[in-house]
Amino acid sequence: TLEEMWEIIDTSEQTQKHCMMMENVNYGREELLFLNMCRKKVIGDLLHAEAAYIHDLRDQMDDVKKRGEGLWRPYHLAKRNGNLYPTHGLGPVAQYMNLSRSEDQFNSIVSYSTPAIGRNLYAKEKHKEDHKWNKIDFKGGDLNTSIIKTNLGRTIMVQWDETSPRPYSRLNLIQGTKGTLAGFPTRVALQGGVPGATEDHHSWATGEQLETLYEKYDHPMYKRLEAKAKKMGGHGGMDFIMLYRMVECLIKGIPLDQNVYEGCFWSSVSQLSEIS
């Protein structure tokens, strides 16, 4: 809740202890590439972002006998209606925009959910009539879309869908006055074209066409840790980079990449979307 987030912030300040949301996707190669390109103004002034957590997790409803998310996650969908997991998509784009660390931050939000149909259908199709999932009327809409406006007038679309039959995506789109960067799959469109790949911004540079951009704009931290990350793994290495970086910051006494304010800042979208 919003009240509990303030308790976390107050406790961190009073005890002078770090509190970092371990949002691993901020350390993916694509996300670090986009962060570096945004910092270098490759796509100009930032205007709009699109973030999401789109992941069909209906099969977790089958894992009720295991010690896993299937034991508790569906209960949130049963009672709550909004964006129940905003940070996985929002974390990276919020950092691209440097929100909460500059003069800009969230100003307002409006949120809409589709009807809640998919979970009820899945329960009927996969489980017996007297199964516990068939005794619940799921309230959470299959897809939630929230639009955030920042103090500087920039916009962010955040979506959440753990029910629909569609491919995984976090969208990861950031749009500026000189181009757009987007994920799933990684693609780039620049005013005047991507050198050696496209002639103008009317087509995306993808796949092998992005090699020159990786060579030029790969984040210094990724370059430094790439070999170790590939060896250690963890969601493609992002888990390792996140853990390595957190320990590195603590040992060297430098600020963490995500602080307590950002963790609560991103998380607040969940309850605010429900209120909206």
PLM regions with names:
Residues 140, 158-169:
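Glycine-rich phosphate/pyrophosphate-binding beta-alpha loops
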Residues 9, 35, 90, 94, ...:
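Non-transmembrane alpha-helical segments in soluble domains
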Residues 155-157, 180:
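Short, mixed charged/polar active-site loops
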Residues 19-23, 157-160, 259:
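Short catalytic-loop micro-motif centered on adjacent basic/acidic residues
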Residues 13-20, 25-137, 246:
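Predominantly a Rossmann-like dinucleotide-binding segment in NAD(P)-dependent oxidoreductases
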Residues 1-18:
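Rossmann-fold NAD(P)-binding glycine/threonine-rich loop
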Residues 165-276:
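C-terminal helical cap and adjacent loop that interface with cofactors, partners, or active-site loops
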Residues 146-152, 176:
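Active-site beta-strand termini and strand-to-loop segments that position acidic
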